[in-house]
Amino acid sequence: MDAKDEKRFNLALQINNFKASLVEFNKLVEQTTAQKKEERAGIFIPKEDSIDYDKFYTSVQQIFGPEVKNQDVKCFYRKLCNNPDAAFDWCEIFGYFSTDEDSLTSQMDEENLVFLVSRKQRIVIAGSRRRDVIKCIVKVPQLDLLITASQKGLITVFNSQDTSWITGCDYLGQLKRIVATTERTIIVWDYKAQGSSQEHYFVIKPMDHCLLCVCVVPLPDQLCRDDILLGDDGGFVNKFTVSSDDFGLKQAKTKKKLQTQVLDSKNFKSVKRKLHNDWVMKIRYIPALNCFGSCSLDSVHSLVLESLKRLEDNLPVREFAMPRGANSFCYCGKANVIVTGGDDKVLRLWHPNISTKPVGKLVGHMFSITEIVSNEKEQHVISLSSAKVFRVWDIQTLSVLQVFHDSQGGPGDMQIYSMVYDANHGMLITGSGVIDMYPLTRMIQDTKQVPHTHEREVNVTLYNKYFHQVLTVCSESVIKVWELETGLQIYQILDPHGLSIELTCAAIDESGYLFATGAYNGTVKIWDFGSGQEMKMMPEGKDWVEEEHGLMRLFFLKPQVKQQHLILALERNGTIKIIQGKEDDIFLTVIWELPDAMPYLQYGSHIVHLKMSTKERTMAIPFPDVELIVQKTSQQTNYSPIVDVDVNCIDVFQTEGYNLIACGTTNGMIILWNFIAASVKEIYRPEDCFSTDPELDPKRFRINDIMFLFRSPECVRRSSQDSICSSTQCDSSKGPQSSKGSKQSIHDADVKGEHTDMVGEQQSASRKQPVPISFVEPQPPLLVSAHEDGHLRLWTLEGKLIKDMLPFTKHSAISLTSLYTDSCCRVLLAGNVEGHVILCSISSFMDPPHDEKKFKQLLSWRAHSLEIIQVIYVEEKQLVLTASIDGSVRIWNSTSGHYCGYFGQRRMFDLSQTSDFILPCDVNEYPIEIKEESKFTEKTQKYEYPLIFDRERWKKMSSMSLLFKRPPLSPFEVQHDFKFFKSLSSPKIRRYALEGFLTENREAGIVFGSLPIYRVPSPTSLRFLPLIGSEVQRDSVEGVYMKKKHDKVKREEAPEMTEGSRRKSLKRNLVPQINLASSFFPTTPK
């Protein structure tokens, strides 16, 4: 079998394999479509048999390989779920959709990276000739060099670390030289040479045509050899191969070199081929495509994209045609497109393998496009026109992000001839008569406009974990659905409940296919999540009072019968009811209502028993019909009807052995409805919650949110090392902002040792007591409540307070508004009215006996400048979603508090934690990481300010007038208040030098000869230095004098005692003493 037959055989085999893959893919689509139809019909499908997105994506990868893009498969899966009856084409799985809709169209994004024009830097090249202009700029990212070449022959190399300038135009990576071109010559120059050798360079000539552009082909596998591509005015592309032997770079250093050496171009290995019918304006080598590109003003052969081998033969090449040719082009690797621009003022986007038609166009320039560069990291394309107008484009959304103009200089003198983007420093560099540098910055940092997802304040935010999408509702009654990973808007619904009817709450069912909305007028609607179509509704009652039946909370309940929907609703008046939706009825009806127990609990009854109704229902519901069993009590407290006692928040908990509803009221009470124990009881009641005080805030006791915390047996079996909290403690110090000081640490002590010991104890305990999987018993649930006074409290079902915490933020005692936890209760999130997010670790705390020391706050950060109404934790992505009344829904990294963006921005999300730490424009506080001090850490006292002996203070303390003021001490009692230590003080900085009378002693030698000798004044006479215990003698003398009143001796006469009598009295009261004067003042020779 020859090569041609083998090639045909391999091609036929690949076609057969692809056809077999298509058959398997069609079977997968048929199976998934049939299952989605059954789910829409209400047929129960076991979880292990259900085909969710993860299973579907894994199956597609097994069929077609790992090259299938995640985003394309997700779009195909979403289309399949929204309309299983629609027709599907296999090419859609590869991203080729036939729709004309542009889902990327949205408003301008203030978070995008743009160029900060106001901080433009300008470098004037010293020594440049008059009216000289920079014709070429090349960036060498490996060495962080910037190379420029002027029209009149000045070549300059700029180094970010060195201000000295060296000359050059493009860089030969293997030879470590700079190559430049003139009209008829090639110049190779050693920019690292020193002294007179710096002017040594090689000239290669002659050339057949005028050289217009040059680039170097990187050859990492070749040593001491480089390939140079040249474009000329004849439409030829030349390739020159240069090596170290060609320039004699290996010769001995003793050999004298001339300053300029002329080399014959015929001695170099070179090939050329005519690819254009006009000037070659730009030539570049693209390593990602392993080919070179050259553009020309030729309208037929405008752009040629081919491998280097095509220069050596006459085989056809890939040609891209465009009117009036192309002046410049660039390649974007992530988007895999080539962008061209020329005199027709249109930027065209081309797929490298499709030369017949561009895949997109960018229109906006009013003059000819002269330069194009790309910002690969941010997916930006920067284009420059002949009028010095810059436009920054988003290559993903095909939209313009920024337009700015270089207004300095005249149109001729200051024309910009070259432009390059420095990815190392995030800077756009242009060359004209000067070099201008535009630093890249976040647009959100350079604007005063706050990010907004909706035009009005956000009322509801929900996360659909099955579709990985986010639903947001604003007070203007606009529903929007967003893609979590990209931030793109999927669809929106305007006025879902009618014109000017505000939506106040919403909920998503367990399967993720439906969501319900509730309005302030009491109406409820059920929608299809995938398509946004209305399915069922409950109209407003005729006798309803305005806003009395407004809905505050909605919960989907597990239906007892298939093909029906049950919704638990909380009204503004405190009523809790169940709304039912049947398959054959488009209207929703109220089938169950909970009686009001507040009138009985407020009179001191801590528990009210329930009577289950014996009435049988045609359709079973999760909660039975109940009646309150009222018992008359003799003790009744005075109840003020002015106090608001309505239910403000509720939560539902239904699992095996539990059927509970927890309620938090506006006056601070927590009520628990237990339908298994047939009782409703008071969990918590603040003191004076029923009394009114006009000087106090009536909302001070209000409970803003309440939630059950329960860890299922499956979660108990999981390892605690998978917890997000442990990863936060371990990885938070590795965050980029920690090294830059963007975080504020409360305690510097390391908790690694304590954490390791705790994990080790858990592992050793698990080894000693192996528990079978089937015998793991779940612990009873806990209650957590968020209070108006800023406290976070945790309760048992019996009403025992096990944790009362005031979260640490910049300002304490801030009202908490929202709570959220993950599926296994490892992390607890809370939001407050000042826009802070509090992240707590509760993984160890949930294990009995619920040690409150294991409840730890890990992180807090300012997410909004206004109140947070909802905080959501996406555990599979370790992200936090926050919604605020400022109209924005923002996304954060949970492990570090890094800001990722907001829904509604023009650019897609980059959820990977980068080193660029940014904040929204309305937030200027860095995240605060909370670290506990380890109990194993020894506290060592540090003395930062040493004390010195203050002679002036000693003189005051040693005066004789202070010797007779204190009462005497008992014998053998030691006086600890030493005056010497009282004479110590902090060092004072002298504003004048000490007096020196001798600056040098020649006889002492040169080592210490320059040390000055200072005069030290003589110490105070030792005669009056006090002794330890002298306080006793001084006070004893005073006692002797007071006894001589019968002799009528005045106190003024006491100093007239003789010296002998004074010494005798001192000897009589002598106690053990120590003379410290010799220690403090050594004797000085006279």
UniProtKB/Swiss-Prot annotation:
Keywords: Repeat, WD repeat. It comes from the Eukaryota. Residues 724-749, 1047-1069 are annotated as: Disordered. The keyword Oxidoreductase does not apply. This is WD repeat-containing protein 64. Gene3D superfamilies: YVTN repeat-like/Quinoprotein amine dehydrogenase (2.130.10.10). The lineage of its organism: Eukaryota, Metazoa, Chordata, Craniata, Vertebrata. Residues 732-744 have a biased composition (Low complexity).
